[in-house]
């Protein structure tokens, strides 16, 4: 099966909101803790080995990286790799810059149509993960959580992790959050959940195509 994300390439990197590209294509943001496997997940989803880079020093990268998706001469979307968060040794000034950059981008970027939130399946819904959710939910746009590294869990542990994350997300719905909050297990190493993630992301950037696929065949 051919996936749209397999046509991905580096587009640009920015360090300030004023430098965000004036593109009109829909954007899918990827966020997560510095050790949640975000870069690895992006590379696997895009079927490339070195599209997204993880800093050798966790938390060091404070830039927003853009990857265009679709035909090179007529891209249909952008994947947006947000800076990793949660590394304790990052200086205070860098943390402040991170908070301003991410919170403002998530709250105000009109092209943004959904957030892919990476959480280590062994440590889901940390305080910083919740902060990311709370920055984004006022937009009413969907959040899809990938519980990464699920290959490191037993089957029962995976079930428990999924239930824990689902329960945490349900609490936001109980508070009246309008946007969709969904979650799945994911392993870049074992390629668990890859098709499910592909299909969901493509449904965000090409909803008309997704609707056509879901329509029953006329008899």
Swiss-Prot record:
Record's keyword annotation contains Cell cycle: yes
InterPro entries, A to Z: G_ENGB_dom, GTP-bd, GTP-bd_ribosome_bio_YsxC, P-loop_NTPase
SUPFAM superfamilies noted in UniProt: P-loop containing nucleoside triphosphate hydrolases
Example of a GO MF term: GTP binding
Residue numbers binding GTP: 32-39, 59-63, 81-84, 148-151, 186-188
Taxonomy, superkingdom: Bacteria
Gene Ontology CC annotation, any one: cytosol
UniProt keyword list: Cell cycle, Cell division, GTP-binding, Magnesium, Metal-binding, Nucleotide-binding, Septation
Presence of keyword GTP-binding: yes
GO biological process: division septum assembly
Similarity comment: family membership: Belongs to the TRAFAC class TrmE-Era-EngA-EngB-Septin-like GTPase superfamily. EngB GTPase family.
HAMAP family xref list: GTPase_EngB (MF_00321)
Protein name (Swiss-Prot/TrEMBL): Probable GTP-binding protein EngB
Organism: Burkholderia lata (strain ATCC 17760 / DSM 23089 / LMG 22485 / NCIMB 9086 / R18194 / 383)
